[in-house]
Regions:
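A generic fold-level signal
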Residues: 19, 26, 67-69, 120
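Conserved donor-nucleotide/metal-binding helix-loop-beta segment in metal-dependent transferases, i.e.
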Residues: 33-74, 79-80, 100
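Catalytic core and acceptor-binding pocket of nucleotide-sugar-dependent glycosyltransferases
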Residues: 9, 82-274
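Aromatic-acidic/polar surface patches that form glycan- and anion
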Residues: 3-4, 64-68, 76-79, 114-118, ...
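Residue-level detector of short, conserved catalytic/binding motifs and their immediate flanks
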Residues: 22, 72-73, 209
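The conserved acidic donor/metal-binding loop of glycosyltransferases
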Residues: 28-32
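Active-site-proximal specificity loops/subdomain of glycosyltransferases
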Residues: 1-23, 37, 48
Length: 277
């Protein structure tokens, strides 16, 4: 398999190679972690024994029949027999199948907003959910936080989010302490009470967990023509530095300009508190 379908045999191989792992986490090469303190709510998915977690919305599947009703570029899949069997069904729509072209036609007939003719993994997954609603017993559509989020929507929020987190650190001295990466999870727990009013998802000022550069194709450079010039590249630089600042900040450094990866400045010991001490 090639292109986007190549993830399925890779995930299968990881399952077989690591039977001790309960979950396998697939993240596309064009997706970046942009909240370094976030912890996946795995207990939520264990409660009803969901086996596949993807970012998506039921109304876009069953009412609007959109091929963007979910994003198959980032998903959690439980390492179990159900998952192995499901991926086998899913992959039957892929290029190794003799019915590959037929599946492309079926997908376009159901999802009118699908722009290209070939069968793709995302449309295939949505089609299975659309035809078999009972699959939602095992497939969880995560829409409560940015399990992955569209970069065009997220990038403009970075500056406001940074300001909000700076205000939190000004108000709580223990969050300003420099600390080792090893104890970052505990500092995330210290910060959590301050984020209760931040909300989650699209209108939240909480850091987005994953910023997904859908359509940018960073490996091939063959990005969607709707993104002009250096839009994709500049966006990825900004996201990387936004995430990098969260790590550097622990050691007293920061990128003052998110579009400038080369410049790092030292912060005062009690930054962002300006004193007097």
């Amino acid at each position: 398999m090639n292109s986007y379908w190549a993830k399925l045999p890779v995930v299968k191989a990881a399952m077989l190679a690591h039977p001790e792992a309960e979950w396998i986490w697939w993240v596309d090469s064009d997706a970046m972690f942009t909240d370094m303190e976030f912890k996946l709510p795995l207990r939520r998915y264990d409660y009803k024994k969901h086996n596949l977690i993807v970012h998506g919305w039921e109304k876009l599947i069953y009412k609007k029949k959109s091929w963007t009703a979910l994003n198959a570029g980032v998903f959690l899949i439980r390492n179990c027999q159900w998952s192995m069997d499901f991926m086998e069904r899913w992959s039957r729509m892929g290029p190794m199948s003799s019915e590959y072209e037929k599946w492309g036609e079926i997908q376009r007939s159901v999802f009118k907003d699908k722009l290209f003719p070939g069968s793709d993994d995302q449309s295939g997954l949505i089609y299975l959910l659309y035809k078999e609603k009972s699959l939602t017993e095992k497939i969880y559509l995560e829409g409560e936080y940015y399990f992955e989020g569209y970069w065009v929507d997220i990038l403009p929020t970075y500056d406001n989010i940074t300001e909000k987190y700076t205000e939190i650190e000004k108000a709580d001295g223990k969050l300003r302490r420099r600390h080792a990466e090893k104890v970052s999870e505990q500092y995330g727990a210290f910060r959590e009470p301050h984020l209760r009013e931040a909300g989650i998802g699209k209108d939240s000022w909480r850091r987005p967990f994953i910023t997904h550069f859908t359509g940018c194709q960073p490996c091939s450079g063959d990005h969607n023509p709707m993104y002009v010039g250096e839009t994709c590249w500049n966006g990825m630089v900004k996201a990387l530095n936004f995430a990098d600042n969260q790590v550097l900040r622990k050691y007293g450094f920061v990128h003052p300009d998110l579009l400038d990866s080369n410049t790092v400045t030292e912060t005062s010991f009690d930054y962002p508190d300006d004193g007097p001490w």
